[in-house]
């Protein structure tokens, strides 16, 4: 992987729970827990579009709007996330380095999916598998967790945008 054309980019990553003080029983009600679950790093890796092309993956038509990827981590819960092919072809990378050095275990060593503009949970750590398909996957992480409750009581899944919630000065 490291022999392929690589790129380095600076990105912000933010936990979807940042500012989540409405949760009951927060252990330590500090600024770090209230607004500090984010960071800015330089990631180095191979653009996912380059990998998909090298593998001969069918990216679909209409700029990838009709295809999806499944990213799976090798962590204890086998964290999985569905990402639209359109997003995957845009700015997503498979990173092996952070801030000029190899990823550390706490940051997803040996590989991490970097997905700018979405919740940090979609930046799959310990990446072990990427699959391409024609519809989103119904994994436990996208059916039971990380869904958005709508005013009408329905749930929205596969949320792909993380609005800015924090200010850094």
Language-model features and meaning:
Residues 1-5:
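Short Gly/aromatic-enriched secondary-structure transition segments
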Residues 6-40:
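Short, conserved helix/loop micro-motifs enriched in His/Cys and acidic residues
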Residues 6, 10, 25, 53-169:
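Extended, aromatic/histidine-rich regions of cofactor-dependent oxidoreductases associated
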């Amino acid at each position: 992987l490291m022999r392929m054309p690589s790129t380095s980019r600076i990105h912000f990553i933010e936990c979807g729970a940042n500012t989540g003080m409405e949760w009951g029983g927060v252990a330590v009600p500090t600024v770090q827990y209230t607004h500090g679950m984010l960071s800015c790093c330089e990631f180095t890796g191979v653009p996912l579009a380059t990998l998909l092309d090298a593998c001969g993956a069918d990216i679909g038509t209409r700029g990838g709007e009709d295809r999806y990827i499944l990213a799976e981590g090798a962590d204890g819960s086998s964290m999985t996330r569905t990402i639209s092919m359109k997003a995957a072809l845009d700015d997503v990378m498979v990173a092996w380095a952070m801030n000029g050095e190899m990823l550390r275990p706490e940051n997803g060593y040996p590989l991490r999916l970097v997905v700018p503009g979405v919740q940090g949970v979609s930046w799959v750590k310990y990446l072990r598998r990427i699959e391409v398909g024609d519809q989103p996957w119904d994994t436990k992480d996208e059916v039971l967790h990380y869904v958005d409750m709508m005013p009408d009581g329905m749930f929205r899944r596969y949320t792909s945008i993380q609005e800015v919630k924090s200010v850094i000065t």
